[in-house]
Amino acid sequence: ADVLDMTPFKSNIALLTRDSVVVLNSSAKEVARLEHNYSDPDMAVYKGRALVYDRTSGDFTLMNSSKILGDGNTGSPIYTAAMGKDGTIAFSLKTSAAQSELCVYNHKLEKIFAWECAQEKIFDISIAPNGKSAALILVGSENAVTYSRLVVLSFKKDNPVVTDIKYDNTLLFDVIYNSSTSIIAYSTDFKKKKKKKGHKEDYSFGSNTLAHE
């Protein structure tokens, strides 16, 4: 079967194909398999857990190497998803009410947070190690010019937006939490030479601000 994605899975490797998720050990021996019937499958992995989802239908299944931990449906098509250290999972959804929506579930698959983004697509998500916040990359277009926003949301606050920085003429494509107070955003600057693949920007932030290190 065609391999759509391959990623480390604890000390093993998880392969996503058009009809299954296969976990192989270091000797390439199959140690787990989950069959799926998703028409447009994708997956997010954190250490020994895999979140397999259908981008079209919104169906998802959470598994480890020995069993299925749970499943559900987001109610909307999925752009992308992420998993956190404490079992938190987050989806970027395509909804009728907004351009995109962040939907967050706890380890019991109970919905704990939602945030609508009116103008931009939530392109990438990283959940903080403590499970209390998420860093997002939003991508939009204004007057035929692409821009990105780096947004940090706190799940517990009435006003969840902790940080919101806009980058004109820039495509941010990957965001990663270094720690609970530090994130790394990877970008491609359209003004730079095409040969340069991209550059990395590190940020550390306190309770309310995000500052370039």
Q: How would you name each of these model-derived features?
A:
Residues 1, 27-35, 66-73, 110-116, ...:
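A short beta-strand motif characteristic of beta-propeller blades
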Residues 1-56:
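N-terminal "mature head" segments of proteins
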Residues 2-8, 37-48, 76-87, 119-129, ...:
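Repeated scaffold domains used in trafficking and secretory/extracellular systems
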Residues 13, 50, 88-90, 131-135, ...:
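Hydrophobic beta-strand positions that form the internal "hydrophobic ladder"
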Residues 15-16, 53-56, 94-99, 142-148:
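Short, solvent-exposed loop/turn segments at conserved positions within beta-propeller repeat blades
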Residues 16, 24-25, 53, 61-63, ...:
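Hydrophobic/aromatic beta-strand positions that recur at structurally equivalent sites within the blades
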